[in-house]
Each structure stands twice: as C-alpha cells, then as structure tokens.
Amino acid sequence: MKKISLAFCLALLSSLFCLAQVSPLQFNKNGEFKIVQFTDIHFKYGNPASDIALKRIGEVLDAERPDLVVFTGDVVYAAPADTAMRKVLSYATDRKIPFVVTFGNHDNEQGKTRAELYDVIRSMPFNIQPDRGGVESPDYVLTLKSSDGKKDAALLYCLDSHSYSKLPDVKGYDWLTFDQVNWYRQQSAAYKAKNGGQPLPALAFFHIPLPEYNEAASDENAILLGTRMEKACAPELNTGMFTAMKEAGDVMGMFVGHDHDNDYAVMWKGILLAYGRFTGGNTEYNHLSNGARVILMKEGARTFTTWIRLKGGEIIDKTVYPDSYMKDDWRKRPLVTE
C-alpha cells in the first residue's frame, strides 16, 4: 500500500512540475499570438481510420508552431476514452505546446464522465486549464500578457456548450445556461475595470454553435467566407450569450465545431462567427479534407488574421477580421481607368 501511495505521489508531483513549467501566455516580441484550433477529431483508439487525424495534427503543429492549441470538442469517439484522450493530446505535449480542451456532445459517451475526462486532461503536461474545483466541467478565461509581460492584453473565453436538451418537449442540443451568461458578463466586466474601463480584445471557443450562426448565414447582405454545406446544428433555445458578448464589447470572434461540413466564417453585428475545420478521419460523416483553423492575434488591436491549413501545407481562406468581412464605401474608391 505504501509503494502504491508513493508511486501516486511521485506521479502527481511530476505532473504538477510539468504544469509549473508552462510560461504565461504572452504576445511575442512582434506583438503576435498564434492559436491552432482542432475540432471534431472523433478519435477511435486503435482504429486505422483515425490515423489520418493524428497525422494531420502533427503536420499542422510542426508547420504552424502555435503558442496555444485549442481542441473544441468531440475529441474521442470510442472507449477507452482516457487512453484515446491522452493519445490525441500527446501531440501537443510532446511538442511542449500549451493546450486546452472544451468538450463536445460526444466526449462523455465513451465510458468516462466529463469530470473524469477533465481530470485526465488536467493531468497532461502543458495543459493550462484550471482545476475543476468540484464542478464537472468549468468555464474559464485565459489571459494573454502583453509582449513586455506587464499587463493583460487579450482574453480567451473557453466554454462548455454541453450535449443535449434536458427538457422533454425541447429536442436537439443543449444551450449555454443563464449562469454561464452571467459568469461571462462578470468576467468581462472585471477585466474591463482592470483595464481602465476599456474592454480587452477577446475570442471565445466552444463546441456547439449559437443560433446566431444560422441567422448570419441566411442574411443575404452578410459576407460569408469558407465552406457551408449544412445548416448549423444549434440549440432551439437562445439564452442570450451573443447579446451579452455584443453588449460587453470585448469578443471579436467565436470559434466552434460540431458541424463537420462547415468551415466558414461570417460577420454578425460586428462579431465573427467562425467554424474550425474538421480534423478527424473517416470515423464520422465528413465531406471536407481534414485540417485545422489557425488564428493570429495582434497585440493592442481589435483585429486578427485567420486561415485553414490542410494536407501538405496547403493554406486556404486566409482572411482578416474585420476588413475581409466588411463592404467598403464604393463612393470613396480611387478612380480606376483600366
């Protein structure tokens, strides 16, 4: 019994030591911070159909060398879920890249609860999520420090969008709760006050798209860039997270997964509603070659560049927020004679 306890303590200390070695997230000397988003990996441990997903993850990380990796849900798709989760996340840990995970609706269907999987994720080196604190799967906000390390320069909100509706007369997927909306409002207000009354530039990451994705995609005047091959499978009920973010004024864009045949981005009332790129193999429906979304933030500016990276280093749909999604005033264009 003593040997088991000692081994457990050593493993725990080793994990804590690795966690302690992760430097604070910070803009580099060029004022840039790069994020890679992987989504809907649907990894099945030991299934050859998932090999291409792991290969693509490795290729993207080696090519982009990001400052942070965000896995936006449906990471694992078969038991053993804990082993599968560790395998996928090892591609970040082996490269010593900080990472976080937001759960999808399928992650806890493989024999492990959200709480159990959260603890597995937290035990991995270079994971920077907070402790659960008794909550099954907490929401959290990551701060990006300025390039000189002296102040908070940007925020990343990471939310659990849950799984399925718990109301018998409401079908489909679950929604962000009022408690989550209130939590976001409180966090945003606190950072705004700390920043002299100015909202910090922010992004949000979660799995299931908000209902506003369908509103924006159906607007004939909206500029939609990327691929849209299916309607957003959003919750039937709208609890106001988009409105809260619009009112707070910090979130520039939100990034989701869930719908494998979408990778588009569209502006809606000043906020970019974007999908990641399906990263998985042929273990679930898909009609897009797998890849990842990359986001490059700029310090001190409400702008970012984003693109999709695919097999063999191919880059598509490179856009700049907000400029790529806004129509210019044609009356002010310089005279063109040819």
What kind of feature is each model-predicted range?
Residues A20-K87:
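N-terminal active-site segment of His-dependent metallophosphoesterases
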Residues E32-Y45, A153-H162, F205, L272-F278:
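Active-site-proximal beta-strand elements of phosphoester/diester hydrolases
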Residues R65-D67, L155-Y157, V170-D263, D329-P334:
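His/acidic metal-ligating clusters that form di-metal
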Residues K44-G46, Y77-D82, V101-K112, Y164-L167, ...:
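Active-site environment of divalent metal-dependent phosphoester hydrolases
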Residues R86-G196, R293-K298:
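Extended active-site neighborhood of metal-dependent phosphoesterases/phosphodiesterases
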Residues F38, T143-K145, K150, M241-A248, ...:
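Binuclear metal-dependent phosphoesterase catalytic core
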Residues A7-L16:
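Bacterial N-terminal signal peptides
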Residues M1-I4:
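Positively charged n-region of N-terminal signal peptides that target proteins for export
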